[in-house]
């Protein structure tokens, strides 16, 4: 009788453990830094610090360096591809704005994926307030909505986080 009770208790515990398992798709070693109402998951390494100000999903690598990743969504007035978003919306602002020495690094640009969507990757350098920066934008479009994942770091520390950022881009997923 004691064996039967022990077996039933064990089966009950196992059933509870299996039924209570949450369906968490967070990749190992990462956490979700997306805002609660975002249409996507922005998975970043555990050691990165989420920074979700003004409804923009983001995280930075550490409090010293401030290398960061952000994701913004853009609803254009007309259907827009990733390439047209960069060329028609972003590029004019960068070239005519406050970024001095702006230069696209064409050999680092190309096709990629973001959350299962075809995307374009753009890498460029510039100076702002006397500091040299390097930025990578990964842009995907559903036609109606444009998603823009941006990684920015000082030129001196950019390479320190590119492996993390490649994992962030790879893990990005729509809800």
Predicted regions and their residues:
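N-terminal targeting sequences that direct proteins away from the cytosol to non-cytosolic compartments
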Residues: 5-11, 15-66, 108-114, 128-132, ...
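Conserved polar/disulfide-associated segments of primarily extracytoplasmic proteins
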Residues: 54-141, 146-147
């Amino acid at each position: 009788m004691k064996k039967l009770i022990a077996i039933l208790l064990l089966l009950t515990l196992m059933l509870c453990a299996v039924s209570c398992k949450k369906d968490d798709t967070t990749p190992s070693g990462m956490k979700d830094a997306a805002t609660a109402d975002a249409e996507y998951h922005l998975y970043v390494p555990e050691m990165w610090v989420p920074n979700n100000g003004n409804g923009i999903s983001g995280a930075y690598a550490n409090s010293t360096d401030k290398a960061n990743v952000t994701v913004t969504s853009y609803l254009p007035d007309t259907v827009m591809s990733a390439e047209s978003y960069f060329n028609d919306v972003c590029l004019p602002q960068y070239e005519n704005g406050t970024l001095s020495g702006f230069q696209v690094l064409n050999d680092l640009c190309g096709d990629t994926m973001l959350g299962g969507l075809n995307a374009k990757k753009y890498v460029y350098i510039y100076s702002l307030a006397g500091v040299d920066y390097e930025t990578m934008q990964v842009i995907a479009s559903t036609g109606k909505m444009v998603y823009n994942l941006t990684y920015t770091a000082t030129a001196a520390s950019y390479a320190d986080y590119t492996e993390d950022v490649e994992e962030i881009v790879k893990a990005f997923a729509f809800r």
